[in-house]
């Protein structure tokens, strides 16, 4: 792709302040917008021009929406992103950016002649649109060697702005410029300040949910729960392709923590086999223990890719400890085939840190905390041979039939998973981002379903005899 070489780049750092005041103009009328792109970190919704091919390049706060005309010889392209004002006023920061951009273009031997500089009233405040003629003989797109460059700045809270950089073939004229301005004024989202406050409140709520369960983990113990993994056919029927079984017992800590604590806690076990009958079989085995007051946790996670069997070719582990002065999570993962290892230590964590062992029991946590309609956040481990992270998980909680439905994303920008819990907080159904489902059943019904589907029921029998001994 040509995008990396076509993105118009400049820097806000080290720019001189200048308060040149552009003339004020009325906002262009807003046309209906068909498509939009979300920049997840900022929860900013960006409209998309109708004749474009948009791409979102995610890089946390530096994420960029890229747009170009859907043509073999595009006549325009653009980028939209959020930039910090670096303690400058909106006027001085935008002028510094324009000056820096002009200098950069002239240093390349390109012309940069300002044609118009206007202030435009918009929903987020008074925006600024600068259009300049840019003659760029070195442009890789012949249609853009003689072009108009647009730098459009939209206020975004007290310390940031939304920056749109556009390059248009001069022949497109004023109509396309006005369309780009309308697009920028159509960007919507909470300000960074309100977003930070909202997320802090959601983390506080997540901490309250976990605190409500402290000293009550004996109530979380349960006998084996069996789940069918299903792919939905076109007619709505389900095709079995895997199983998950989980159970929990209450008792003393494992030997690895025997010298650290004598308190009781919850042992959580989970076995998963998926991908049966597909090209991507996968198995997973999890064992964890979390202390009753959630002051300690230890867990081990093993997985196998390419085979649906009760063994592993990858492994991960975690150790969590909360004291009066610090909250720490130590996470490690490795690939037993390649010997690749990852190890990370997280310190100073908030109270809203969800133990890995409770990831299948969040419904019970919400019931105990009497949460049925709310959005909460908590930090939760993400473990694989490719990734070791402690990310801010977001849960949208809502009442559903006789229980609760939770739509959650493991981290910002990733697709959501939907969990449905009954009134007691027991997981009844999980819908994964790919549309597959995990549905609560019983062992006898599961064996029968596998027989009908022609799946190897001996795997179920082996797993039950080897692991399911609560």
Can you say where each PLM-predicted feature lies in the sequence?
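N-terminal targeting sequences that direct proteins away from the cytosol to non-cytosolic compartments
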Residues: 3-77, 108, 140-145, 155-160, ...
């Amino acid at each position: 792709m040509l995008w990396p070489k076509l993105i118009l780049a400049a820097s806000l750092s080290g720019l001189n302040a200048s308060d040149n005041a552009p003339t004020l103009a009325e906002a262009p009328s807003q046309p209906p917008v068909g498509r939009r792109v979300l920049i997840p970190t900022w929860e900013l919704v960006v409209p998309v021009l109708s004749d474009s091919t948009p791409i979102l390049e995610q890089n946390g706060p530096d994420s960029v929406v890229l747009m170009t005309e859907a043509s073999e010889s595009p006549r325009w392209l653009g980028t939209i992103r959020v930039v910090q004002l670096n303690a400058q006023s909106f006027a001085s920061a935008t002028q510094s950016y324009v000056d820096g951009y002009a200098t950069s273009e002239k240093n390349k031997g390109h012309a940069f002649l300002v044609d118009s500089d206007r202030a435009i009233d918009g929903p987020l405040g008074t925006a600024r649109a600068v259009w300049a003629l840019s003659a760029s003989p070195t442009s890789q797109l012949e249609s853009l060697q003689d072009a108009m460059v647009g730098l459009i700045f939209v206020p975004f809270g007290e310390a940031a702005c939304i920056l749109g950089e556009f390059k248009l073939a001069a022949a497109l004229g004023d109509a396309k410029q006005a369309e780009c301005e309308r697009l920028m004024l159509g960007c919507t989202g909470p300000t960074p300040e309100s977003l930070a406050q909202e997320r802090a409140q959601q983390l506080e709520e997540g901490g309250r949910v976990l605190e409500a369960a402290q000293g009550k983990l004996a109530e979380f113990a349960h006998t084996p729960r069996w789940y069918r993994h299903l792919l939905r056919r076109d007619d709505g029927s389900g095709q079995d392709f895997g199983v998950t079984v989980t159970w929990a017992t209450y008792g003393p800590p494992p030997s690895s923590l025997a010298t650290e604590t004598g308190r009781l806690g919850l042992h959580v076990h989970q076995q998963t086999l998926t991908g049966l009958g597909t090209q991507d079989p996968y198995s997973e085995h999890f064992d964890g223990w979390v202390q009753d007051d959630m002051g300690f946790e230890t867990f081990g996670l093993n997985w196998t890719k390419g085979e649906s069997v009760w063994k592993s070719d990858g492994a991960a582990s975690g150790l969590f400890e909360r004291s009066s002065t610090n909250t720490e999570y130590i996470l490690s993962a490795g690939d037993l085939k390649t010997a690749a290892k990852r190890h990370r230590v997280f310190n100073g964590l908030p109270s809203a840190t969800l133990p890995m062992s409770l990831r299948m029991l969040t419904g019970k946590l919400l019931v105990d905390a009497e949460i049925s309609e709310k959005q909460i956040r908590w930090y939760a481990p993400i473990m694989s041979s490719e990734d070791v992270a402690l990310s801010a998980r977001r849960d949208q909680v809502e009442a559903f039939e006789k229980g609760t439905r939770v739509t959650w994303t493991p981290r910002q920008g990733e697709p959501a998973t939907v969990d449905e819990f009954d009134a007691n907080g027991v997981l009844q159904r999980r819908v994964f981002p790919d549309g597959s489902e995990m549905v609560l059943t019983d062992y006898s019904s599961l064996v029968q379903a596998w027989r009908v589907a022609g799946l190897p029921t001996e795997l179920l029998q082996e797993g039950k005899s080897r692991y399911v001994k609560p």
